[in-house]
Amino acid sequence: MTYDFDALTDRSGTYSLKWEEAGDALPMWVADMDFTTAPPIREAMRRRLDHGVFGYSIVPDEWRQAYIGWWRDRHGVTFERESLIFCTGVIPAISSMVRKLTTPAENVVIQTPVYNIFFNSILNNGRNVLEAPLTYDAAAGRYAIDWEDLERKLADPQTTLMILCNPHNPSGQIWDRGTLTRLGELCWEHHVTVISDEIHCDLTDPGFEYVPFSSVSEHCRMNSVTCIAPTKTFNLAGLQTAAVMVPDPVLRHKVWRGLNTDEVAEPNAFAITAAVAAFTEGGPWLDELRAYLAGNKRAVRAAVDEYNASVDTARRVTLVEGDATYLLWLDCSALTDDTERLCDHLFAEQRLMLSPGAQFGGNGRYFVRINAATQRERVDEGMRRLTAGLRSFR
Protein backbone atom coordinates (compact mmCIF):
# COMPACT_ATOMS: atom_id res chain seq x y z
CA MET A 1 0.00 0.00 0.00
CA THR A 2 1.12 3.56 -0.73
CA TYR A 3 -0.73 4.95 2.29
CA ASP A 4 -0.15 3.78 5.86
CA PHE A 5 -3.58 3.33 7.39
CA ASP A 6 -2.05 1.29 10.23
CA ALA A 7 -0.26 4.36 11.63
CA LEU A 8 -1.93 5.26 14.92
CA THR A 9 -3.31 8.79 15.18
CA ASP A 10 -3.65 10.71 18.43
CA ARG A 11 -6.76 12.89 18.31
CA SER A 12 -6.48 14.15 21.88
CA GLY A 13 -6.43 17.93 22.11
CA THR A 14 -8.25 18.36 18.78
CA TYR A 15 -11.74 18.73 20.30
CA SER A 16 -12.80 15.48 18.64
CA LEU A 17 -16.41 14.61 19.46
CA LYS A 18 -15.67 10.93 18.97
CA TRP A 19 -12.75 10.79 21.38
CA GLU A 20 -13.64 13.51 23.89
CA GLU A 21 -17.06 11.94 24.59
CA ALA A 22 -15.43 8.55 25.13
CA GLY A 23 -12.96 9.72 27.77
CA ASP A 24 -10.62 6.80 28.46
CA ALA A 25 -12.76 4.35 26.48
CA LEU A 26 -12.08 3.07 22.96
CA PRO A 27 -14.58 4.93 20.74
CA MET A 28 -16.16 2.93 17.91
CA TRP A 29 -19.39 4.88 17.72
CA VAL A 30 -19.86 8.20 15.86
CA ALA A 31 -19.28 7.96 12.10
CA ASP A 32 -15.94 9.58 11.43
CA MET A 33 -12.58 7.96 10.75
CA ASP A 34 -9.32 7.93 12.69
CA PHE A 35 -7.20 8.22 9.53
CA THR A 36 -5.50 11.38 8.30
CA THR A 37 -7.14 12.55 5.10
CA ALA A 38 -5.62 12.13 1.64
CA PRO A 39 -2.27 13.93 1.16
CA PRO A 40 -3.48 16.00 -1.84
CA ILE A 41 -6.24 17.44 0.35
CA ARG A 42 -3.83 18.30 3.16
CA GLU A 43 -1.42 19.88 0.69
CA ALA A 44 -4.16 21.97 -0.93
CA MET A 45 -5.37 23.14 2.47
CA ARG A 46 -1.83 23.95 3.56
CA ARG A 47 -1.39 26.17 0.51
CA ARG A 48 -4.67 27.88 1.30
CA LEU A 49 -3.64 28.31 4.95
CA ASP A 50 -0.26 29.75 3.99
CA HIS A 51 -2.01 32.42 1.93
CA GLY A 52 -3.11 33.87 5.25
CA VAL A 53 -6.27 35.73 4.19
CA PHE A 54 -9.59 34.08 5.04
CA GLY A 55 -12.32 36.35 3.77
CA TYR A 56 -15.61 35.42 2.16
CA SER A 57 -15.58 32.77 -0.56
CA ILE A 58 -17.53 32.22 -3.75
CA VAL A 59 -18.54 28.88 -5.27
CA PRO A 60 -16.42 28.71 -8.45
CA ASP A 61 -17.11 26.61 -11.52
CA GLU A 62 -14.04 24.55 -10.59
CA TRP A 63 -16.07 23.18 -7.66
CA ARG A 64 -18.94 22.11 -9.93
CA GLN A 65 -16.58 20.51 -12.43
CA ALA A 66 -14.90 18.53 -9.63
CA TYR A 67 -18.25 17.00 -8.62
CA ILE A 68 -19.26 16.41 -12.25
CA GLY A 69 -15.96 14.69 -13.08
CA TRP A 70 -15.99 12.48 -10.00
CA TRP A 71 -19.54 11.19 -10.51
CA ARG A 72 -18.92 10.68 -14.23
CA ASP A 73 -15.69 8.76 -13.74
CA ARG A 74 -16.52 6.85 -10.53
CA HIS A 75 -20.25 6.22 -10.93
CA GLY A 76 -21.05 6.65 -14.61
CA VAL A 77 -23.54 9.44 -13.98
CA THR A 78 -23.62 12.86 -15.63
CA PHE A 79 -24.62 15.85 -13.51
CA GLU A 80 -25.71 19.05 -15.20
CA ARG A 81 -23.66 22.00 -14.02
CA GLU A 82 -26.72 24.04 -13.02
CA SER A 83 -28.15 21.18 -10.95
CA LEU A 84 -25.45 21.48 -8.25
CA ILE A 85 -25.86 23.77 -5.25
CA PHE A 86 -23.29 24.19 -2.48
CA CYS A 87 -24.39 23.66 1.12
CA THR A 88 -22.57 23.48 4.43
CA GLY A 89 -23.59 19.90 5.14
CA VAL A 90 -26.03 17.14 4.29
CA ILE A 91 -27.98 17.46 7.54
CA PRO A 92 -28.32 21.27 7.36
CA ALA A 93 -29.57 20.77 3.80
CA ILE A 94 -32.06 18.07 4.79
CA SER A 95 -33.41 20.19 7.64
CA SER A 96 -33.76 23.15 5.29
CA MET A 97 -35.59 21.05 2.70
CA VAL A 98 -37.96 19.60 5.29
CA ARG A 99 -38.93 23.18 6.12
CA LYS A 100 -39.16 24.36 2.50
CA LEU A 101 -40.79 21.36 0.82
CA THR A 102 -43.39 20.50 3.48
CA THR A 103 -45.76 22.31 5.81
CA PRO A 104 -46.10 21.81 9.59
CA ALA A 105 -47.78 18.54 10.64
CA GLU A 106 -47.22 16.85 7.27
CA ASN A 107 -45.63 13.40 7.18
CA VAL A 108 -42.06 12.62 6.20
CA VAL A 109 -41.40 8.93 5.51
CA ILE A 110 -38.19 7.24 6.65
CA GLN A 111 -37.23 3.57 6.44
CA THR A 112 -36.20 2.43 9.88
CA PRO A 113 -33.81 1.52 11.33
CA VAL A 114 -32.07 4.50 9.79
CA TYR A 115 -29.63 7.31 10.55
CA ASN A 116 -30.95 8.79 13.77
CA ILE A 117 -30.47 12.45 12.84
CA PHE A 118 -33.25 12.10 10.24
CA PHE A 119 -35.65 12.04 13.19
CA ASN A 120 -34.25 15.35 14.47
CA SER A 121 -34.51 17.02 11.06
CA ILE A 122 -38.19 16.13 10.91
CA LEU A 123 -39.37 16.56 14.50
CA ASN A 124 -37.41 19.75 15.19
CA ASN A 125 -39.24 21.35 12.26
CA GLY A 126 -42.71 20.43 13.46
CA ARG A 127 -43.32 17.64 10.95
CA ASN A 128 -44.41 14.07 11.65
CA VAL A 129 -42.04 11.12 11.39
CA LEU A 130 -43.81 8.34 9.51
CA GLU A 131 -41.76 5.17 9.87
CA ALA A 132 -41.91 2.56 7.12
CA PRO A 133 -39.94 -0.16 8.92
CA LEU A 134 -37.73 -2.40 6.85
CA THR A 135 -38.30 -6.13 7.21
CA TYR A 136 -35.41 -8.12 8.63
CA ASP A 137 -34.43 -11.65 7.66
CA ALA A 138 -32.41 -12.80 10.64
CA ALA A 139 -31.21 -15.98 8.94
CA ALA A 140 -29.84 -14.11 5.93
CA GLY A 141 -28.77 -11.03 7.88
CA ARG A 142 -30.47 -8.71 5.37
CA TYR A 143 -33.11 -5.99 5.29
CA ALA A 144 -35.80 -5.51 2.65
CA ILE A 145 -38.60 -3.05 1.93
CA ASP A 146 -42.13 -3.92 3.02
CA TRP A 147 -43.75 -2.68 -0.18
CA GLU A 148 -47.35 -2.94 0.99
CA ASP A 149 -46.64 -0.93 4.12
CA LEU A 150 -44.55 1.65 2.24
CA GLU A 151 -47.19 2.25 -0.42
CA ARG A 152 -49.91 2.66 2.17
CA LYS A 153 -47.88 5.36 3.89
CA LEU A 154 -46.90 7.12 0.68
CA ALA A 155 -50.57 7.16 -0.37
CA ASP A 156 -51.58 9.15 2.72
CA PRO A 157 -52.37 12.70 1.49
CA GLN A 158 -50.51 14.04 4.52
CA THR A 159 -47.29 12.43 3.27
CA THR A 160 -45.33 14.81 1.04
CA LEU A 161 -41.66 13.89 1.51
CA MET A 162 -39.50 10.79 1.88
CA ILE A 163 -35.88 10.67 3.04
CA LEU A 164 -33.96 7.74 1.55
CA CYS A 165 -30.59 6.57 2.87
CA ASN A 166 -28.62 5.20 -0.10
CA PRO A 167 -26.44 3.29 0.77
CA HIS A 168 -28.24 2.48 3.97
CA ASN A 169 -26.97 3.54 7.39
CA PRO A 170 -26.74 1.62 9.74
CA SER A 171 -26.97 -1.69 7.83
CA GLY A 172 -24.49 -0.87 5.06
CA GLN A 173 -26.79 -2.31 2.41
CA ILE A 174 -26.66 -1.06 -1.17
CA TRP A 175 -30.11 -0.63 -2.70
CA ASP A 176 -30.21 -2.24 -6.15
CA ARG A 177 -31.55 -0.63 -9.31
CA GLY A 178 -34.83 -2.55 -9.28
CA THR A 179 -35.59 -1.55 -5.70
CA LEU A 180 -34.82 2.10 -6.35
CA THR A 181 -36.89 2.14 -9.53
CA ARG A 182 -39.92 0.67 -7.78
CA LEU A 183 -39.56 3.08 -4.87
CA GLY A 184 -39.22 6.03 -7.24
CA GLU A 185 -42.35 5.08 -9.18
CA LEU A 186 -44.40 4.81 -5.98
CA CYS A 187 -43.22 8.23 -4.85
CA TRP A 188 -43.98 9.73 -8.26
CA GLU A 189 -47.45 8.17 -8.30
CA HIS A 190 -48.29 9.56 -4.86
CA HIS A 191 -46.66 12.99 -5.35
CA VAL A 192 -44.02 12.43 -2.68
CA THR A 193 -40.66 14.15 -3.22
CA VAL A 194 -37.55 12.08 -2.43
CA ILE A 195 -34.45 13.33 -0.65
CA SER A 196 -31.72 10.76 -1.25
CA ASP A 197 -28.89 10.97 1.27
CA GLU A 198 -25.93 9.45 -0.60
CA ILE A 199 -23.12 10.66 1.64
CA HIS A 200 -21.74 7.11 2.09
CA CYS A 201 -21.82 6.34 -1.65
CA ASP A 202 -18.06 6.16 -2.23
CA LEU A 203 -17.39 3.87 0.72
CA THR A 204 -18.45 0.64 -0.96
CA ASP A 205 -16.50 -2.57 -0.51
CA PRO A 206 -14.12 -3.37 -3.39
CA GLY A 207 -16.10 -5.00 -6.18
CA PHE A 208 -19.36 -3.31 -5.21
CA GLU A 209 -20.92 -0.15 -6.64
CA TYR A 210 -23.80 1.93 -5.37
CA VAL A 211 -26.63 3.03 -7.66
CA PRO A 212 -27.43 6.78 -7.63
CA PHE A 213 -31.18 7.19 -7.09
CA SER A 214 -31.46 9.89 -9.76
CA SER A 215 -29.92 7.59 -12.38
CA VAL A 216 -32.51 4.80 -12.45
CA SER A 217 -35.41 6.56 -14.21
CA GLU A 218 -36.60 9.94 -15.42
CA HIS A 219 -39.23 10.01 -12.66
CA CYS A 220 -36.55 9.40 -10.03
CA ARG A 221 -34.37 12.08 -11.58
CA MET A 222 -37.03 14.78 -11.73
CA ASN A 223 -38.67 14.04 -8.38
CA SER A 224 -35.61 13.99 -6.16
CA VAL A 225 -32.86 15.89 -4.43
CA THR A 226 -29.55 14.04 -4.02
CA CYS A 227 -27.31 14.95 -1.07
CA ILE A 228 -23.60 14.29 -1.64
CA ALA A 229 -20.30 15.33 -0.08
CA PRO A 230 -16.62 14.46 0.27
CA THR A 231 -16.91 14.51 4.05
CA LYS A 232 -17.57 10.84 4.91
CA THR A 233 -15.34 9.55 2.13
CA PHE A 234 -12.29 11.68 2.94
CA ASN A 235 -12.87 12.28 6.68
CA LEU A 236 -13.67 15.99 6.30
CA ALA A 237 -16.84 16.26 8.39
CA GLY A 238 -15.49 19.19 10.38
CA LEU A 239 -14.98 21.32 7.24
CA GLN A 240 -18.69 21.72 6.44
CA THR A 241 -18.65 21.15 2.70
CA ALA A 242 -21.38 19.37 0.74
CA ALA A 243 -23.73 19.68 -2.23
CA VAL A 244 -27.27 18.99 -3.32
CA MET A 245 -28.00 17.88 -6.87
CA VAL A 246 -31.46 18.86 -8.15
CA PRO A 247 -32.23 18.26 -11.85
CA ASP A 248 -35.78 19.65 -11.89
CA PRO A 249 -35.57 23.47 -12.19
CA VAL A 250 -38.75 24.19 -10.21
CA LEU A 251 -37.73 21.93 -7.34
CA ARG A 252 -34.18 23.30 -7.56
CA HIS A 253 -35.41 26.86 -7.09
CA LYS A 254 -37.33 25.88 -3.96
CA VAL A 255 -34.31 24.09 -2.53
CA TRP A 256 -32.00 27.00 -3.40
CA ARG A 257 -34.38 29.46 -1.73
CA GLY A 258 -34.53 27.32 1.39
CA LEU A 259 -30.77 26.92 1.67
CA ASN A 260 -30.23 30.66 1.27
CA THR A 261 -33.02 31.58 3.68
CA ASP A 262 -31.48 29.27 6.26
CA GLU A 263 -27.97 30.66 5.58
CA VAL A 264 -26.41 27.26 4.82
CA ALA A 265 -25.36 28.01 1.23
CA GLU A 266 -22.06 29.88 1.71
CA PRO A 267 -18.68 28.14 1.94
CA ASN A 268 -16.05 28.77 4.58
CA ALA A 269 -12.47 29.50 3.55
CA PHE A 270 -11.48 25.82 3.26
CA ALA A 271 -14.67 24.16 2.03
CA ILE A 272 -14.11 24.66 -1.70
CA THR A 273 -10.38 23.92 -1.60
CA ALA A 274 -10.88 20.62 0.24
CA ALA A 275 -13.74 19.44 -1.97
CA VAL A 276 -11.95 20.21 -5.23
CA ALA A 277 -8.77 18.46 -4.09
CA ALA A 278 -10.75 15.44 -2.89
CA PHE A 279 -12.69 14.96 -6.09
CA THR A 280 -9.83 15.68 -8.49
CA GLU A 281 -6.87 14.03 -6.72
CA GLY A 282 -8.25 11.73 -4.01
CA GLY A 283 -9.07 8.62 -6.05
CA PRO A 284 -5.92 6.55 -5.42
CA TRP A 285 -6.10 7.19 -1.67
CA LEU A 286 -9.78 6.22 -1.60
CA ASP A 287 -9.20 2.95 -3.42
CA GLU A 288 -6.61 1.92 -0.84
CA LEU A 289 -8.88 3.08 1.98
CA ARG A 290 -11.74 0.92 0.71
CA ALA A 291 -9.49 -2.13 0.64
CA TYR A 292 -8.27 -1.39 4.17
CA LEU A 293 -11.80 -0.92 5.49
CA ALA A 294 -12.85 -4.20 3.90
CA GLY A 295 -10.02 -5.85 5.82
CA ASN A 296 -11.24 -4.25 9.04
CA LYS A 297 -14.74 -5.56 8.40
CA ARG A 298 -13.35 -9.05 7.81
CA ALA A 299 -11.53 -8.78 11.14
CA VAL A 300 -14.79 -7.88 12.88
CA ARG A 301 -16.57 -10.79 11.22
CA ALA A 302 -13.78 -13.18 12.20
CA ALA A 303 -14.03 -12.05 15.83
CA VAL A 304 -17.82 -12.50 15.79
CA ASP A 305 -17.44 -15.97 14.26
CA GLU A 306 -14.87 -16.94 16.89
CA TYR A 307 -17.16 -15.70 19.65
CA ASN A 308 -20.15 -17.59 18.24
CA ALA A 309 -18.14 -20.80 18.02
CA SER A 310 -17.31 -20.53 21.72
CA VAL A 311 -20.80 -19.96 23.17
CA ASP A 312 -24.15 -21.71 23.25
CA THR A 313 -26.45 -21.13 20.29
CA ALA A 314 -28.75 -19.12 22.54
CA ARG A 315 -26.05 -16.46 23.05
CA ARG A 316 -24.87 -16.00 19.46
CA VAL A 317 -24.89 -12.68 17.61
CA THR A 318 -25.22 -11.94 13.88
CA LEU A 319 -23.63 -9.32 11.64
CA VAL A 320 -25.93 -7.87 9.00
CA GLU A 321 -24.57 -8.40 5.48
CA GLY A 322 -23.54 -4.94 4.29
CA ASP A 323 -21.49 -3.99 1.24
CA ALA A 324 -20.95 -0.29 1.93
CA THR A 325 -19.93 2.15 4.68
CA TYR A 326 -17.46 1.44 7.47
CA LEU A 327 -20.34 0.76 9.87
CA LEU A 328 -21.38 -2.71 11.00
CA TRP A 329 -24.80 -3.56 12.40
CA LEU A 330 -24.69 -6.34 14.99
CA ASP A 331 -27.83 -8.29 15.87
CA CYS A 332 -27.74 -9.01 19.62
CA SER A 333 -31.36 -10.16 19.93
CA ALA A 334 -30.28 -13.48 21.43
CA LEU A 335 -28.83 -11.56 24.37
CA THR A 336 -31.21 -8.64 24.92
CA ASP A 337 -34.09 -6.55 23.61
CA ASP A 338 -32.39 -3.44 25.03
CA THR A 339 -28.95 -2.81 23.60
CA GLU A 340 -28.78 0.49 25.47
CA ARG A 341 -28.19 -1.68 28.52
CA LEU A 342 -25.65 -3.79 26.62
CA CYS A 343 -23.74 -0.68 25.50
CA ASP A 344 -23.74 0.64 29.07
CA HIS A 345 -22.25 -2.69 30.15
CA LEU A 346 -19.56 -2.59 27.44
CA PHE A 347 -18.66 0.96 28.38
CA ALA A 348 -18.51 0.29 32.13
CA GLU A 349 -16.75 -3.07 32.05
CA GLN A 350 -14.68 -2.99 28.86
CA ARG A 351 -14.25 0.75 28.22
CA LEU A 352 -15.67 0.26 24.73
CA MET A 353 -18.07 2.82 23.25
CA LEU A 354 -20.55 1.62 20.62
CA SER A 355 -23.86 3.06 19.36
CA PRO A 356 -27.01 1.46 20.82
CA GLY A 357 -29.50 0.72 18.08
CA ALA A 358 -32.76 2.04 19.54
CA GLN A 359 -31.94 5.58 18.35
CA PHE A 360 -32.19 4.35 14.74
CA GLY A 361 -35.83 3.27 15.16
CA GLY A 362 -37.43 0.15 13.73
CA ASN A 363 -35.99 -3.01 15.26
CA GLY A 364 -32.85 -1.16 16.30
CA ARG A 365 -33.24 -1.91 20.00
CA TYR A 366 -31.86 -5.41 19.28
CA PHE A 367 -28.71 -4.09 17.58
CA VAL A 368 -25.50 -2.18 18.18
CA ARG A 369 -23.63 -0.19 15.53
CA ILE A 370 -19.87 -0.58 15.26
CA ASN A 371 -17.59 1.94 13.54
CA ALA A 372 -14.65 0.05 12.03
CA ALA A 373 -12.92 3.10 10.50
CA THR A 374 -9.83 2.99 12.65
CA GLN A 375 -6.44 1.34 12.67
CA ARG A 376 -6.41 -2.48 12.58
CA GLU A 377 -4.72 -2.60 15.96
CA ARG A 378 -7.66 -0.70 17.47
CA VAL A 379 -10.21 -2.82 15.61
CA ASP A 380 -8.63 -5.97 17.03
CA GLU A 381 -8.59 -4.48 20.53
CA GLY A 382 -12.19 -3.35 20.14
CA MET A 383 -13.26 -6.84 19.14
CA ARG A 384 -11.39 -8.32 22.11
CA ARG A 385 -13.33 -5.99 24.40
CA LEU A 386 -16.62 -6.60 22.60
CA THR A 387 -16.48 -10.37 22.76
CA ALA A 388 -15.36 -10.31 26.40
CA GLY A 389 -18.27 -8.00 27.18
CA LEU A 390 -20.76 -10.18 25.31
CA ARG A 391 -19.62 -13.19 27.32
CA SER A 392 -20.07 -11.43 30.66
CA PHE A 393 -23.34 -9.65 29.83
CA ARG A 394 -26.42 -10.89 31.68
Tell me the role of every PLM-derived stretch.
Residues 54-185, 202-203, 210-215, 219, ...:
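Conserved core of the PLP fold type I
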Residues 2-89, 96, 278-281, 393-394:
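N-terminal small-domain helix-loop-helix segment of the aminotransferase-like
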Residues 220, 336, 345-354, 360-394:
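PLP-dependent enzyme catalytic core of the Aspartate aminotransferase-like
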Residues 276, 292-301, 319-332, 364:
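Conserved glycine-rich beta-strand-loop-beta hairpin in the small C-terminal domain of fold type I
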Residues 218, 222-294, 390:
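Conserved core segment of the aminotransferase class I/II
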Residues 51, 62, 66, 250, ...:
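A non-catalytic, amphipathic alpha-helix used as a structural packing/dimerization or gating element
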